């Protein structure tokens, strides 16, 4: 069951990708969707065995590589964390597969699309089921490659090419960090297996590594590189620029990769390595600060976006910040709780946005929409449910998971927790503001489309509606149903998954917070709804003119539109200097400059010039050529003996090239 659960997406990908043109589009796509549905069902069964029966399944499949003391084996680890992740991955992926059957119906390359989706699911499952760092890194790189291929699926579009390259290059920085973190793990622990590393970790908390003459705590140094990987993959502040641009791919790709699964790989990495990272207060503080700042940054940028998919993308970035700073405060169960609920309502939002885009002939600018509430009522209801769940409307899934993060953050009573909680409350208001702004601009007011566009607006087809309805039901009920399971006091589910200090029982502390603090998210929701209604519902110029003329509003708006100048600063301080270094210095002056002059080209040119001059001075006769040939043979023998004795081959080749160039009578001098 466990191995079948892992390889079914791979089988679907191979059949669709390799044999799709022989089987036909319809049959091959049905095979891919069927494999994904079976994978989701098997994941639910595995979840029953692991989660409800409170067991762990760990088995080895054989040796992968053995070099010296490095022994890497194929192994699968199914604990509570893995079970939750594979349920989320396979359920969302199966819904996206079903949705894409109609969404990509007119695309001539749809079999390739389904093959990519299934292969991505396989790599994601390989990542979360790995029992060692090397296997995890293999899955980590696999999802990065598939992200590039799926963003660039419409490869004839220049913007898709740029976005895919931007995503893969920025993720290289994160992959570089994780790679060096794995090297340090092997250096310190002499193993890459999680079981060995986590067993030894409590005994080396004081172990140090000499780095450039300074003694650095080993766990802190390893954690620093792991954090770089987390920041890259989960689009945290500093390496976040790729996520909004990744919206150039098809909308189902955005729902699967950039909302529910791939971007949560960084959060999963923190949770998986929690028995190691929990011993470094420095790393935990860094995670808290980065997550909180990412939440604030993404919220402020989302307020001023006009592309419907980019608004949801920045919302994803913001919610990932919540998960990361919850991990930094050792509140791991709340983090995985929010990850699970977020996956369902964010996939719902993206797929609902896809239905809107599909119905409006690929229009994504919210300023060119409006009045769709009567034309697409079912899509509106699904979008409304997803929006309410995201903003923390009482008794929907986001209400439980996000509130528990905010309450437990404040309940730490350390400055890091207070800092994260304050930013979280502010971001809760901002999230509600831009979510209802999206809802109002898209579905209310007068239609702002052309008449022919309005005439062609239609509700989504059955295959697109079914996933929306299922995800909407999950967005309503899954938070309430699983609350005690994830964050209930005394729940045994996480005993074998991640580690936190025993005294760090934040659930009890959050239950005795002041009433005002518990009501803050509700007030943030109320004000977040009222504000966009006042400004955007039945827009009137006299209502907006004073706001638009306010200098502070103008400057803030410009600052947010420029994305805090991150793109500008990264281009000026990193991209342009590295471009000049690589092109002007390394390429023009060294590779095609100095090295060519003193290297093969320069030596060959010098010899050609010298022998050409000699050739012009002498009379070209048969005896001259015979003399050159004899001299060449003697020179080759001498140089060969010299090369054999010294091992110096480079100059020998240069001399032979030059001499043969002169000796061949076919050479003509113009």
From Swiss-Prot:
InterPro entries hit by this protein: NADH_DH_su5_C, NADHpl_OxRdtase_5_subgr, ND/Mrp_TM, NU5C-like, Proton_antipo_N
Record carries keyword DNA-binding:
no
What GO cellular-component annotations does this UniProt entry give? mitochondrial inner membrane; respiratory chain complex I
NCBIfam families with a match to the protein in the record: NDH_I_L, PRK06590.1
Which family, according to the similarity comment?
Answer: Belongs to the complex I subunit 5 family.
Which molecular function terms from Gene Ontology are attached? NADH dehydrogenase (ubiquinone) activity
One GO BP: electron transport coupled proton transport
Which is one Pfam family of this protein?
Proton_antipo_N
Q: Which organism is it from?
A: Dictyostelium discoideum
Give the keywords, sorted: Electron transport, Membrane, Mitochondrion, Mitochondrion inner membrane, NAD, Respiratory chain, Translocase, Transmembrane, Transmembrane helix, Transport, Ubiquinone
Q: List the taxonomic lineage.
A: Eukaryota, Amoebozoa, Evosea, Eumycetozoa, Dictyostelia
**What catalytic activity is recorded?**
a ubiquinone + NADH + 5 H(+)(in) = a ubiquinol + NAD(+) + 4 H(+)(out)
Protein topology in the membrane: Multi-pass membrane protein
Q: Which residues form a coiled coil?
A: none
- The record lists the membrane-crossing segments as 1-21, 31-51, 81-101, 111-131, 133-153, 178-198, 211-231, 251-271, 283-303, 311-331, 339-359, 375-395, 421-441, 462-482, 519-539, 566-586, 594-614, 629-649, 650-670
Q: Which PANTHER family does this UniProt record tie to the protein? A: NADH-UBIQUINONE OXIDOREDUCTASE CHAIN 5
Protein function: Core subunit of the mitochondrial membrane respiratory chain NADH dehydrogenase (Complex I) that is believed to belong to the minimal assembly required for catalysis. Complex I functions in the transfer of electrons from NADH to the respiratory chain. The immediate electron acceptor for the enzyme is believed to be ubiquinone.
- What is the protein's given name? NADH-ubiquinone oxidoreductase chain 5
- Where in the cell is the protein located? Mitochondrion inner membrane
Q: Write the Enzyme Commission number(s) for this entry.
A: 7.1.1.2
């Amino acid at each position: 069951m466990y191995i079948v659960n892992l390889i079914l997406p791979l089988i679907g990908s191979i059949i669709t990708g390799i044999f799709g043109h022989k089987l036909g589009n319809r049959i091959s796509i049905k095979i891919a969707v069927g494999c994904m549905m079976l994978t989701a069902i098997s994941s639910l069964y595995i979840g029953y065995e692991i989660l409800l029966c409170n067991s762990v399944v760990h088995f080895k499949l054989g040796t992968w590589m053995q070099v010296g003391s490095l022994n890497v084996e194929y192994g699968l680890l199914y604990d509570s964390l893995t079970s939750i992740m594979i349920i989320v991955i396979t359920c969302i992926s199966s819904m996206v597969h079903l949705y894409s059957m109609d969404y990509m119906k007119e695309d001539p390359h749809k079999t390739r699309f389904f093959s990519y989706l299934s292969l991505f699911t396989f790599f994601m499952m390989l990542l979360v089921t790995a029992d060692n760092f090397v296997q995890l890194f293999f899955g980590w790189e696999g999802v990065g490659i598939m992200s590039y291929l799926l963003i660039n699926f419409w490869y004839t579009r220049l913007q898709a090419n740029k976005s895919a390259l931007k995503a893969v290059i920025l993720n290289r920085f994160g992959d570089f960090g994780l790679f060096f973190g794995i090297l340090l793990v092997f250096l310190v622990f002499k193993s890459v297996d999680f079981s060995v590393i986590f067993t030894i970790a409590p005994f080396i908390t004081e172990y140090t590594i000499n780095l450039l003459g300074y003694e650095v705590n080993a766990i802190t140094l390893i954690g620093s590189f792991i954090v770089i990987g987390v920041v890259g993959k989960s689009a945290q502040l500093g390496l976040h620029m790729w996520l909004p641009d990744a919206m150039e791919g098809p909308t189902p790709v955005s729902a699967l990769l950039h909302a529910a699964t791939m971007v949560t790989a960084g959060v999963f990495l923190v949770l998986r390595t929690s028995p190691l990272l929990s011993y470094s207060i420095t790393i935990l503080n860094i995670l808290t600060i980065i997550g909180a700042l990412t939440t604030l940054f993404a919220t402020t940028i989302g307020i001023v976006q006009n592309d419907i998919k980019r608004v949801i993308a920045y919302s994803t970035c913001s919610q990932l910040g919540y998960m990361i700073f919850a991990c930094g405060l050792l509140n791991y169960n709340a983090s995985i709780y929010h990850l699970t609920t977020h996956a369902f309502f964010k996939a719902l939002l993206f797929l609902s946005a896809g239905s809107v885009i599909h119905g409006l002939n690929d229009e994504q600018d919210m300023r060119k929409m409006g009045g769709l509430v009567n034309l697409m009522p079912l899509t509106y209801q699904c979008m409304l449910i997803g929006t309410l769940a995201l903003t923390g409307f009482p008794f929907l899934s986001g209400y439980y998971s996000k509130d528990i993060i905010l309450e437990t953050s404040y309940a730490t009573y350390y400055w890091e927790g207070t800092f994260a909680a304050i930013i979280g409350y502010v971001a809760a208001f901002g999230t509600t503001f831009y979510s209802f702004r999206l809802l109002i601009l898209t579905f209310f007011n007068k239609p702002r489309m052309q008449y022919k566009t309005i005439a062609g607006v239609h509700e989504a087809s059955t295959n697109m509606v079914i996933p929306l309805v299922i995800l909407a039901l999950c967005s309503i009920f899954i938070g309430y149903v699983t609350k005690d399971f994830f964050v209930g006091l005394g729940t045994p589910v996480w005993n074998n998954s991640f580690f936190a200090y025993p005294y760090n029982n934040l659930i009890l502390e959050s239950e005795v917070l002041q009433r005002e603090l518990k009501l803050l998210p509700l007030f943030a929701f109320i004000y977040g709804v009222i504000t966009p209604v006042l400004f955007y519902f039945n827009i009137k110029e006299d209502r907006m003119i004073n706001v638009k003329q306010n200098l502070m509003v103008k400057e803030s708006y410009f600052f947010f539109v420029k994305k805090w100048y991150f793109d500008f600063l990264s281009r000026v301080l990193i991209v342009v200097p590295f471009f000049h270094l690589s092109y002007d210095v390394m390429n023009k002056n060294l590779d095609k400059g100095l090295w060519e002059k003193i290297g093969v080209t320069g030596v060959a040119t010098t010899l050609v010039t010298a022998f050409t001059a000699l050739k012009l001075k002498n009379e070209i006769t048969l005896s001259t050529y015979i003399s050159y040939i004899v001299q060449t043979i003697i020179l080759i023998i001498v140089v060969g003996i010299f090369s054999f004795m010294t091992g110096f081959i480079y100059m020998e080749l240069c001399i032979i090239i030059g001499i043969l160039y002169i000796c061949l009578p076919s050479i003509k001098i113009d």
